[in-house]
């Protein structure tokens, strides 16, 4: 397994968005089977991509750990893009970028819904963040940008032209169940995202300090926690539901991944593990039985 680092290599954003543009047509076809909200669900994470340097290896790993299946597609120019499914539920996409000059780019990247991506990018810049790429048009999907927030955490922005996945789709094992920012300044980060996407902030007192939840349309959209040590760069952590977190964590190690934080009663009642896949992408496993 590769060593992982939570760093930003801006060059790979350009490649990612070019791939998304090329493969937006097959994604558009698949969206026709998803219940979509008539209104924009600003602040909601509405899509995720795994950027990896070895799609075949990543497919094997996630098939064993999360039970995923896949559909390989190609867009204009023959660029490959893999759609990820948990049962019949479309979960995310997967793209391969194997460029030795762009180290440490393997990661999960989430996209937040915004009403107007151009205005959102202007806001990001006004608060000390940056737009690494975009906004760009994604045929049949909408407009997207990839940004670094003021603390340099990477996230995508998506202004959907077809509607956002409706909140009636319940979380379940195998799909994304939560998104969490590990932050160097949780209060500042919460204010930034709340202002960017029109969200409310709810503060919860927890054993390790204040946990901030971002809400919009009456729904919890994401959480923000202080980073445990100063040597961790701020980053968004994607949580995937599993039936048994201890079993899933054991599968991670059996399939060549690494468990950074195993399930423990001292941390969120043992319901969560933080792991790294064999290519170096960090993610969380969350026990989800609802």
What are these language model-derived features?
Residues 4, 23-40, 44-53, 83, 100-123, 128-177, ...:
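Vicinal oxygen chelate
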Residues 28-30, 49-89, 126, 134-142, ...:
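Core segments of cupin and vicinal oxygen chelate
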Residues 33, 39, 53-55, 115:
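Residue-level hotspots at or immediately adjacent to binding/recognition sites across diverse folds
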Residues 76-126, 132-133, 138, 224:
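Intrinsically disordered, glycine/charged-rich N-terminal periplasmic/extracytoplasmic linker segments
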Residues 78, 106, 208, 234, ...:
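Residues that act as N-cap/strand-start positions at coil-to-secondary-structure junctions
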């Amino acid at each position: 397994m590769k060593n992982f680092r939570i760093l930003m290599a801006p060059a790979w954003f350009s490649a990612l968005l070019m791939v998304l543009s090329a493969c937006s047509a097959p994604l558009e076809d698949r969206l026709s089977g998803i219940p979509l909200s008539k209104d924009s669900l600003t602040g909601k994470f509405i899509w995720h991509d795994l950027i990896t340097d070895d799609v075949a290896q990543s497919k094997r790993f996630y098939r064993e750990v999360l039970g995923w299946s896949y559909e390989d597609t190609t867009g204009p120019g023959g660029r490959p893009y893999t759609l990820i499914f948990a049962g019949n539920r479309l979960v995310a996409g997967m793209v391969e970028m194997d460029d030795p000059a762009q180290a440490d780019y393997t990661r999960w990247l989430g996209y937040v819904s915004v009403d107007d991506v151009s205005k959102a990018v202007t806001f990001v810049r006004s608060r000390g963040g940056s737009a690494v790429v975009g906004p760009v048009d994604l045929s049949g999907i909408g407009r997207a940008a990839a940004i670094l927030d003021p603390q340099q955490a990477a996230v995508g922005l998506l202004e959907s032209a077809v509607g956002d996945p409706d909140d009636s789709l319940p979380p379940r094992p195998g799909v994304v169940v939560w998104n969490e920012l590990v932050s160097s300044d949780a209060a500042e980060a919460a204010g930034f995202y709340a202002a960017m996407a029109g969200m409310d902030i709810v503060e919860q007192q927890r054993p390790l300090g204040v946990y901030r939840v971002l809400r919009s349309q009456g729904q919890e959209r994401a959480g923000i926690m202080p980073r445990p040590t100063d040597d961790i760069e701020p980053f968004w952590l994607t949580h995937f539901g599993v039936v048994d977190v201890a079993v899933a964590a054991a599968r991670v190690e059996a399939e060549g991944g690494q468990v950074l934080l195993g399930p423990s009663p001292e941390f969120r009642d043992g319901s969560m593990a933080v792991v790294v896949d064999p290519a170096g992408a960090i993610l969380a496993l969350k026990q989800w039985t609802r």
